[in-house]
Amino acid sequence: MPGPVTSRKALAYAVAAIVALTAIIAWRSASAKKATAEQDVHPVPVNLNATLTNEMSDTSSLDGFDKMVKNYLTYWAINGASLSVMRNDSLLFAKGYGIADTDKEMQPGYILRMASVSKLVTAVGIMVLRDRGLLTLRDKVFGPDGILCDSIYNAAIKDTLYYRITVEDLLRHKGGFSKRGGDPMFSTRWIMMQNGWTEVPTQERLMELQLKRRLRFVPGTAQEYSNFGYLALSMVIEKLSGTDYETFMQENVLRPAGCVDFHIAGNYYKHKLPNETRYYVQHDDEPADEFNNSGRKVTRCYGGNNVTGLSGAGAWAASTPELALLVASIDGKPEVPDIITRESVDLMTEYFDESTYSLGWNDTKDSYWTRTGTFAGTSALIKYFPDGECWIFISNTSTYKGPGLAHHTAELFDKLRAKYSSKLPARQMFYPEPQEDEESQSDEKNWFEF
């Protein structure tokens, strides 16, 4: 039989175990309450594209608003468009106008190609890598010490100025690339003909071809808008993440922001996603040579360019509500949690001068953040205003104005804001309305109000 000392030790061990177990239970309970409280502060967004409908933004106080938008589409012969309005990270309005496809009304849940607005998405991906310590904006991109240091690329470089190109240079269109002789991202057919290629060049082959060319200016000393520079950034993301560009962006940028329906667009109507719109050009637009040098003539928005091959320079498709949610996730406001650090937000939106692009944004002068995108079948505009409102418009039709249409869309935004900003419903459509039982109901404002 155990002695008295042994019995006392056993009793002490038992008491200690009970105390420890009680502490663990209390800690877990407190942690659970804390987690629940945090979830209450920042609710999880719903699948916006499967939830939002035009009827949710129908109100008699905005009848004149709808008329102005419809008149705008009629004037520019635009078949359909999506418009979303956000204020201080709250989605107030989301509506489709015109048609999404034959006999299909445009709804806010339809996704549309966004052209160069894709560059903003890519820039966010770069900033996510920066926040994780995987790169700095000063990192060199090419050469033996660069990120894209593959031997095949190093062997292709003839102009040593390539060794000076930094990640920031690419983000600001200061890499030294030139579109003289054609933009390589929109000259696939000519590139195939000039090089005797029978297959559409991969991004790796395009990169090798570009690196054989001389740069137009010393990197960082001037700027020239470059789609190729953002293809290079897409490849930087792939190299550092070890996965393909679309997958990395969806898993590490878009889904953390609550955006579940962003996709790299296809080239042809047969490749469109179930909730993607049809694209249109003007009725007098001449058929184009197919980008793959097949010898066929095609509608310019379906095969005239290698849209998929644009990757992070212009290939994304999304709805305007989800695009608004992404902007809310990178704007530094607390209402929707940001997916990048405050420092990265400031870096992206810092304004220098008219000859310096912002990071991903076209321009951020006086806190007016602007991002545009245009190619056959698409015109897109994001306009973020100093008062916290953000207006996003994407059409499924291109016009003879080309990139110039964005200027007229911005004028439409100004007119609508002047007349109807105060009449927009005060609500939060990014998140579902919370369900309360009778005991918890009160007259106080809920989190979805402001």
Residue locations for each model-derived region?
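Hydrophobic (often cysteine-bearing) scaffold residues that line and stabilize catalytic clefts
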Residues: 61, 65, 114, 118, ...
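Short active-site loop at a secondary-structure junction
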Residues: 74-82, 103-169, 217-228, 311-314, ...
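Catalytic loop of the DD-peptidase/beta-lactamase superfamily, centered on the K-T-G motif
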Residues: 2-95, 250, 292-450
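Short, surface-exposed loop or secondary-structure junction motifs
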Residues: 155-368
